[in-house]
Amino acid sequence: MSGAALGLEIVFVFFLALFLLHRYGDFKKQHRLVIIGTLLAWYLCFLIVFILPLDVSTTIYNRCKHAAANSSPPENSNITGLYATANPVPSQHPCFKPWSYIPDGIMPIFWRVVYWTSQFLTWILLPFMQSYARSGGFSITGKIKTALIENAIYYGTYLLIFGAFLIYVAVNPHLHLEWNQLQTIGIAAANTWGLFLLVLLLGYGLVEIPRSYWNGAKRGYLLMKTYFKAAKLMTEKADAEENLEDAMEEVRKVNESIKYNHPLRKCVDTILKKCPTEYQEKMGRNMDDYEDFDEKHSIYPSEKSLVKLHKQVIYSVQRHRRTQVQWQILLEQAFYLEDVAKNETSATHQFVHTFQSPEPENRFIQYFYNPTFEWYWECLLRPWFYKILAVVLSIFSVIVVWSECTFFSTTPVLSLFAVFIQLAEKTYNYIYIEIACFLSIFFLSICVYSTVFRIRVFNYYYLASHHQTDAYSLLFSGMLFCRLTPPLCLNFLGLTHMDSSISHKNTQPTAYTSIMGSMKVLSFIADGFYIYYPMLVVILCIATYFSLGTRCLNLLGFQQFMGDDDMTSDLVNEGKELIRKEKRKRQRQEEGENRRREWKERYGHNREDSTRNRNIHTDPKESNFSDVNTNRSAFKYTRANNRTERDRIELLQDAEPLDFNAETFTDDPLESESGRYQPGGRYLSMSRSDIFNDV
């Protein structure tokens, strides 16, 4: 099994990163370089999380071998060396090789490749690709130029920070500047920035994740929160449609002014390709190909303005598409949660859906997840399961907070992570060591990464599932992962006292900490910032528990879901009404489709039989008629059939209620024939101003 576990985890982590990227990204529409860059960043970060437990178990085995080699057989105590505590005699307690043992020399090379590749991605390549993807240039040269200009300040800041550390080391008379020390300074600067952000995200996730499961077990909580999301998403959806309309109006004007032989026509064609298909069909070229442009009597947009318009179109189309998909997903969630609320009082213990799933389910899932099992899970088991899971996660959070505040204490050892690992180290239970390390670092990663997936920065950074994340957000997430994962793992090794700078023992370090270098070059960071700054997680957890951040966002006008707030109640009621209208609309559509299906099944076959009999009894002499008469007869029958079909459609038209008004407007803004595209009419009442009328 030597090295086999490492190879299996490398393959498994690759497919895990590929699966998550497929869920959030769009392989068909997004650029290949964006997909490859994001996949590589996620893959390297996940590798660090999954491979680090193997490094810990291998290091413990190497420490045992080193202690056994330095111990004399007749004596029962070890020489002052790797272990400060007494070790048993090797003949009585031999060092067992772990099942996942990695041969010497592999892990240092592996960590160097993974770490420095991830650092190159996060500090150099991904920021450049981010600016390149957001650029509205029409050529590769133009996009590269824009990306370099945008990143000039970005890279200048890094050079300034690195220069400050460099001056500190150069001025200090007790330090001699060498290449290893320069490397350590760079690693310390990157880890310091990452640890600063890590504690902020960790303090939020340690409280919010257990609380989300506890609140999810409450009856009606998820449904109320879904109503709240529906009201906010409708406002965002209307805003996205208005922005798209404004962008398409500008494109229409540019398309009409710049003719086929204008030098900038290729730029306009590039912009048109980025527009939705329905807008392209509506506008077309919208010009006369035989009409030349006149430079003297017309005012044409510049290339710089077209670049700005191109960037605006890309952003507007992506945001509009994302809100449309999210709205449909939110509707399905709301309908399902309403079904759960209705089925809770069911006496038959059979889960009944209001609407059938549009996608056919797997037969295997249908067999086991039948209506009876679904009722017991959704109405009885799931709330209890969520409560138990919330309690377990809360215990993990308390352990993390306690260990973050006490991991610097070595005598006695107060960090619970260090206590558990040292107990397993005495018996060389490598399976337990790897499982404990993996669960601990996995929980820390979930708390940090889930916060990264949840945060949203003014629509510029937003990870949306169902392939709705844009290139800018994907690359930004890759940058965050590469910056957060190394300090996260270094912090975990400090919690378990596997880092010699924390345990203050002359023991063999892990291969991961060996590539970080000695932090004694920057003692104020190693002995100060790395130890005392993580204690701030206590303050952040308290602030998150009392929802101080949520209340501040509410005061600033960014509405958040709070049960004791009047604005939240108004938005919940508004969202409930929106869901009710959409539900009634879908019910009418399904009823209309059912009536059409019944009409075809009842009268479709009779009409085909009568037509077939009429053709059989037709006079054979009619076949000698001229082609003109044949065409005329066919035209008459076509008109008759069309008239009958129109009558049938009119009979099948759904009768709308008397109070029906908003649903008569169409979702497609292209049906307006005016020169200016009309904004979505039914969303005007849902504008952002209506939300704050009662304030």
UniProtKB/Swiss-Prot annotation:
Residues 1-5, 54-105, 172-186, 409-432, 495-521 are extracellular. The keyword Transferase does not apply. GO terms for biological process: adrenergic receptor signaling pathway. It comes from the Eukaryota. The modification Phosphoserine is found at residue 633. InterPro entries: GPCR-associated_LMBR1, LMBR1-like_membr_prot. Keywords: Cell membrane, Coiled coil, Disease variant, Glycoprotein, Intellectual disability, Membrane, Phosphoprotein, Transmembrane, Transmembrane helix. Glycans are attached at residue 78. It is a multi-pass membrane protein. Its main location: membrane. The keyword Cell inner membrane does not apply. GO terms for cellular component: membrane; plasma membrane. Residues 588-624 have a biased composition (Basic and acidic residues). Changing residue 178 to K: In DENBA; uncertain significance. Residues 22-32, 127-150, 208-387, 454-473, 543-695 are cytoplasmic. The chain crosses the membrane at residues 6-21, 33-53, 106-126, 151-171, 187-207, 388-408, 433-453, 474-494, 522-542. Residues 227-262, 571-603 form a coiled coil. It is found in: Cell membrane. Residues 581-628, 662-682 are annotated as: Disordered. It is linked to Developmental delay with variable neurologic and brain abnormalities: An autosomal dominant disorder characterized by onset of motor and speech delay in early childhood. Disease severity and clinical manifestations are highly variable. Most patients have delayed walking and variably impaired intellectual development. Additional features may include seizures, spasticity, and ocular abnormalities. Brain imaging often shows thin corpus callosum and may show white matter atrophy, myelination abnormalities, or enlarged ventricles. Belongs to the LIMR family. Recruited to ligand-activated beta-2 adrenergic receptor/ADRB2, it negatively regulates the adrenergic receptor signaling pathway. May also regulate other G-protein coupled receptors including type-1 angiotensin II receptor/AGTR1. This is G-protein coupled receptor-associated protein LMBRD2. It comes from Homo sapiens. The gene is LMBRD2.
